Every structure is written in C-alpha cells, then in structure tokens.
Design a protein with these regions (language model features):
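Catalytic cores of carbohydrate-active enzymes across secretory and cytosolic contexts
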Residues: 1-12, 17, 23-176, 183-186
C-alpha cells in the first residue's frame, strides 16, 4: 500500500564507532542526566552538535532517493534540520521517547531555538502522549515567534509544515509513521 516509499532501515549510526573519543566522552557526559555546571555547558553543546553532525553524515552516505528517514531520541534533535539542509526532499520523521518539557522549563535552555528548529526539520514528530505534543507546540509558538500552530496536529515555520502525532502504543511504532506518511499523500 505504501509503494517504494515504505520506511526502511538503512543505517544505524552510533557514537561508539568513530575515532573522536573526546567528543564521545563529552557527548555521553552531556546526555547522562547528570547536572552540568555552567562552565561545562558550551563544551557539552559543541559535543552534542558534533555528534548530530556525524549521524547526519552517516545518513547522507547511505540515503537513496525514496528512502524515509526516521530519527529517534532527544540526543539527536538537531539531525532533522541538518539532514534537510543536504536532502531537502527527503521524508524525515522524528520520535521523541521522553516527555517534552513545558515552555517555562524549555525557555531557559541557551540553545532552545536551535533545538526547536532542528526538530522542525522533520516532516513528522511523534510523541508518547498528547500533553507532550502540546508542550512542543507551546514551546514553538513562544520561542520561535514566527511559528504558527495549525490546530494541535501541525506546526508551520518558515514555509514548512511539520505534522505532530501521538503514538501511545509503543516506543518504536513504525506503523504510526507509515500512516502519517500515507495520509500526507492525500
């Protein structure tokens, strides 16, 4: 039913398969959930960006026309926009496996704009529960002033529309992504 555009697993990039151990250590430390001191934040952000760039490069190397790209997890929130810069016509989905914070919490992050713009590079963003999707919409409309919410299920930013979906059934629900892509054809 989905033709040749059916999602496929084409690559798995991991931070452990590259030679930049210093970046890996900084990235792992930043993602470990430990609290960061203010003087460490710039260093951790640079490692985060670098790791997202490496994932993007891996996708670019294996991408073939018609592939769907599905990115998973908060540790790769910049990847959709990075991929979009190289592959403007690619179909990109992103799945957020953790709660998305409220705008009151999110607005204190120094790189809040970059994170939101990174996510909005996706065609679809999946959340676990409706409240997390609402938090994302509120963050976008408050932080990215040019953003508009099209109902509760879509965000428009800089001429692109990103669809939001809620899939409570499981963490890796490829069926939800397939359905979203299929419905977008009509």
């Amino acid at each position: 039913a989905f033709g040749s555009r059916r999602p496929t697993t084409t690559a798995t990039a991991t931070t452990s398969n590259n030679n930049n151990n210093d970046d890996n250590n900084r990235y792992t430390r930043a993602q470990s959930g430990s609290s960061a001191q203010p003087h460490q934040m710039k260093d951790m952000w640079e490692a985060y960006v670098s790791t997202n760039q490496r994932f993007t490069e891996t996708v670019r190397e294996v991408y073939e026309d018609g592939d769907m790209i599905w990115v998973h997890g908060y540790h790769l929130m910049l990847v959709p926009l990075m991929i979009r810069a190289y592959l403007p016509n690619a179909t990109i989905g992103f799945n957020m496996h953790i709660p998305f914070p409220t705008s009151e919490i999110f607005r204190v992050l120094p790189w809040r704009r970059e994170i939101l713009m990174g996510l909005l590079g996706a065609d679809f963003i999946g959340f676990q529960v409706p409240g997390h999707s609402r938090h994302f919409v509120h963050c976008c409309t408050r932080v990215l002033l040019g953003t508009s919410s099209i109902g509760a299920a879509q965000i428009s930013y800089r001429g692109r529309v990103t669809r939001l979906l809620v899939c409570e059934c499981c963490f890796y629900c490829i069926h939800c992504f397939e359905c979203c892509f299929y419905c977008s054809l009509f």
